């Protein structure tokens, strides 16, 4: 795919934000986590960080929100740095086809989650990150990593959201205990879940999130420091997993309509990567029936159509 940034990208982003502001159908906010239930569904933000160091943003791009499952991309990157491909003995790489918190497949597949982006898989990833750490140290490692990627020490964990998840996370506790019964969780379940809930409670703006995703646009290299966060091959494989599994059981529909790797979260955020071109973050808290941002998904579809960005596109983008 040719490396091209549309010359009128700010105008495109502004137009998309204006369209989303006028939309009536916004979906429903996640009401099972207290800290998310109170968020105004009228919010919409978008930020695009391009390969040449520019940032294009509109709407509520500087308002922090709970990134939730988008954090699984960063935790996965840390876990792969610790254990490498040995991780794939404990977590699969296939789309699930079931809800993100489903327990059904775990029994049939002997406690091995389908992929690292459903809840069960992300809990295994948290178990890997926890190795050799106290829970607070593991949480600190994730927070420092994301701050470094974004170049912003103002990123924090929302403790209220984390506590709300702990108070209501009975399904996640069931998943973790079930996997422990198969020997696929090695640390105490309460410690693993503590890391997982705090990771999901990271609060970031679209601008911060777009900056944090830039290393996946740059074949694993930190664009500010030149440091190799991951190898080019590993960056491509993380992007591939985002493409296949990044939107729960709506991943195929997202690939069909948008055509770029992405990871969504029930806080309404979506991080997308156009390899070699851009890192994109959108946020609108209203969710569709699959648990993905209604307006965020539509905005990304509009952006891909306006720019020609797609991993399936071999023509020169316009």
UniProtKB/Swiss-Prot annotation:
<dbReference type="GO" id="GO:0006537">
    <property type="term" value="P:glutamate biosynthetic process"/>
</dbReference>
<feature type="binding site">
    <location>
        <position position="172"/>
    </location>
    <ligand>
        <name>substrate</name>
    </ligand>
</feature>
<dbReference type="InterPro" id="IPR015868">
    <property type="entry name" value="Glutaminase"/>
</dbReference>
<dbReference type="GO" id="GO:0004359">
    <property type="term" value="F:glutaminase activity"/>
</dbReference>
<dbReference type="InterPro" id="IPR012338">
    <property type="entry name" value="Beta-lactam/transpept-like"/>
</dbReference>
<feature type="binding site">
    <location>
        <position position="266"/>
    </location>
    <ligand>
        <name>substrate</name>
    </ligand>
</feature>
<feature type="binding site">
    <location>
        <position position="69"/>
    </location>
    <ligand>
        <name>substrate</name>
    </ligand>
</feature>
<feature type="binding site">
    <location>
        <position position="196"/>
    </location>
    <ligand>
        <name>substrate</name>
    </ligand>
</feature>
<protein>
    <recommendedName>
        <fullName>Glutaminase</fullName>
        <ecNumber>3.5.1.2</ecNumber>
    </recommendedName>
</protein>
<feature type="binding site">
    <location>
        <position position="165"/>
    </location>
    <ligand>
        <name>substrate</name>
    </ligand>
</feature>
<dbReference type="GO" id="GO:0006543">
    <property type="term" value="P:glutamine catabolic process"/>
</dbReference>
<comment type="subunit">
    <text>Homotetramer.</text>
</comment>
<feature type="binding site">
    <location>
        <position position="248"/>
    </location>
    <ligand>
        <name>substrate</name>
    </ligand>
</feature>
<keyword id="KW-0378">Hydrolase</keyword>
<comment type="similarity">
    <text>Belongs to the glutaminase family.</text>
</comment>
<dbReference type="Pfam" id="PF04960">
    <property type="entry name" value="Glutaminase"/>
</dbReference>
<feature type="binding site">
    <location>
        <position position="119"/>
    </location>
    <ligand>
        <name>substrate</name>
    </ligand>
</feature>
């Amino acid at each position: 795919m040719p490396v091209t940034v549309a010359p009128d990208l700010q105008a495109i982003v502004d137009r998309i934000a204006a369209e989303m502001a006028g939309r009536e159908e916004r979906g429903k906010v996640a009401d099972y986590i207290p800290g998310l239930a109170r968020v105004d569904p009228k919010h919409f933000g978008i930020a695009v960080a391009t390969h040449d160091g520019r940032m294009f943003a509109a709407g509520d791009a500087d308002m922090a929100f709970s990134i939730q499952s988008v954090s699984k991309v960063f935790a996965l990157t840390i876990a792969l740095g610790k254990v490498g491909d040995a991780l794939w003995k404990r977590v699969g790489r296939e789309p699930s086809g079931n809800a993100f918190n489903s327990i059904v497949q775990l029994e049939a597949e002997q406690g091995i989650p389908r992929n690292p982006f459903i809840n069960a898989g992300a809990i295994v990833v948290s178990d890997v990150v926890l190795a050799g750490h106290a829970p607070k140290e593991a949480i600190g490692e994730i927070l420092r990593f994301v701050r470094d990627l974004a170049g912003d020490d103002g990123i924090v964990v929302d403790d209220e959201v984390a506590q709300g998840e702990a108070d209501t996370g009975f399904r996640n506790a069931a998943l973790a205990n079930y996997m422990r019964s198969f020997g696929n969780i090695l640390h105490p379940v309460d410690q693993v879940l503590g890391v997982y809930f705090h990771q999901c409670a990271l609060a970031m703006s679209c601008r911060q999130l777009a900056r944090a995703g830039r290393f996946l646009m740059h074949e694993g290299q930190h664009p500010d420091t030149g440091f190799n966060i991951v190898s080019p091959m590993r960056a491509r494989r993380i992007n591939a997993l985002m493409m296949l599994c990044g939107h729960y059981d709506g991943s195929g529909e997202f690939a069909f309509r948008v055509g770029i790797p992405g990871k969504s979260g029930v806080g309404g955020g979506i991080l997308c990567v156009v390899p070699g071109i851009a890192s994109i973050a959108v946020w609108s808290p209203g969710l569709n029936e699959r648990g993905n941002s209604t307006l965020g998904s539509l905005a990304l579809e509009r952006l891909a159509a306006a720019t020609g960005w797609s991993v399936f596109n071999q023509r020169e983008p316009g």
